């Protein structure tokens, strides 16, 4: 089974495809670093993560009990995007065959979900303002 999988990867040039789309993935992920909730954005190939911060200027994290990461994950899911919250980090890992258009859709939904989470953070009084 593993050898057949490797054969398919080679026939379909999956690694070459990842090389072609990973730049766009990284650019779209880095654009979200400008969002008020995001303190850090990082990517390697088609894996990426956003670290959510209470205060991005001072890199102050939210309290674990605030559950901002799970709240953002829930909003992503409600909007049709599956991500994984690991604490207050949102992990993105699309299929290796994803297209530039699908990457745009992923990050458009992520941005909308972050906006909704930012509103929720304000409503919950989780920021000192």
Would you name each region that the model predicts?
Residues 1-129:
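Conserved N-terminal phosphate-binding loop of PLP-dependent enzymes in the Aspartate aminotransferase
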């Amino acid at each position: 089974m593993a050898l057949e999988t490797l054969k398919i990867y080679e026939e379909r040039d999956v690694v070459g495809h990842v090389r072609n789309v990973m730049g766009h993935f990284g650019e779209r992920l880095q654009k979200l670093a400008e969002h008020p909730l995001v303190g850090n954005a990082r990517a390697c190939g088609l894996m990426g993560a956003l670290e959510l911060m209470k205060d991005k200027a001072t890199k102050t994290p939210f309290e674990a009990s605030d559950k901002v990461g799970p709240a953002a994950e829930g909003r992503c899911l409600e909007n049709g995007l599956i991500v994984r919250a690991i604490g207050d980090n949102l992990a993105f890992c699309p299929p290796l065959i994803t297209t530039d258009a699908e990457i745009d859709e992923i990050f458009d939904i992520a941005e909308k979900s972050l906006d909704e989470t930012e509103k929720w953070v304000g409503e919950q009084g989780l920021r000192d303002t």
